[in-house]
Each structure stands twice: as C-alpha cells, then as structure tokens.
Regions:
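Polytopic transmembrane helical bundles with strong interfacial aromatic enrichment
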Residues: 1-136
C-alpha cells in the first residue's frame, strides 16, 4: 500500500466519525425529537447520510484498486482525492439543498451534489480505464 493511499484512507476512516454523529442527529430528526422539518427535508437528510456512508466505503475500496492499477502522481492523486471528495460533495448537496425553514424544494446548494457526481464519475472512469490497461 502506498503512502498516498495510507494518508487518504486514514483521513477517510477518521471522517467516518462525522457520519456516525450524523446518524445520531438523523435518528433524532426521524424520531420527532427535533420538530419542524418537512418531509422533503427529512428525505434529503436520509439521502445525504446514506450517500456519505456508501460513497466512503466505495472510496476506501477504490484506494486499493488505485494502487493495483499503478496510478501514481499526478493522476493517482487526482483519483484518490476525487474518491475522497465525492462523499463530502454529494452529501453536502443533499444537506445543503434542504436548508431553510419549511423547505419543500431543493435550494441552490444542490449544485454540490452534481459537482460530487461529476467528480465521482471522472474518478471511476480514470480508475476503471487504468485497471483495464494494467491487466497482465
């Protein structure tokens, strides 16, 4: 495992604690502890939390594939950072889009979701292509 992968993986594992905290907050919202959220907001919060967790797991797995594909600087760094940034951007888009009292429509911060989708897509294509080229 490369030092670059160890660095990004270590940061991602530490970031999982924020997803855990978000889960306790989400549980409070869904249980009615925090009143005043619309169904739209609750749905966006659920989606943001779920995407953060799933995309973080994908990022950790992709880091190992990045090493196997032989991707090194600067493309390797771009792929690693792209996979690590995608969960943050996508979940920020879901959470940010739901901000505002009584919100029932996505706000302007939904743009972060789409930025995250494109970053993730680019990282997937680069890594997938590199893996196909690295076949022995």
């Amino acid at each position: 495992m490369t030092n670059a992968t160890k660095l990004i993986a270590g940061l991602l594992l530490i970031a999982v604690t924020t997803i855990e905290y978000g889960g306790t907050f989400l549980r409070g919202i869904l249980s009615g502890k925090y009143a005043g959220f619309t169904e739209f907001q609750r749905s966006m919060f659920r989606a943001g939390h779920a995407h953060a967790g799933v995309l973080t797991i994908l990022a950790l797995v992709a880091l190992l594939f990045t090493d196997q594909a032989g991707l090194y600087a600067p493309i390797g760094w771009a792929v690693r950072i792209g996979f690590a940034a995608a969960p943050v951007l996508v979940s920020a888009g879901f959470f940010g889009a739901a901000m505002g009292n009584g919100s029932t429509q996505p706000g302007g911060l939904i743009a972060f979701l789409w930025i995250g989708v494109f970053v993730l897509g680019g990282s997937l294509i680069l890594l997938g292509t590199a893996l196909l080229r690295a076949r022995g």
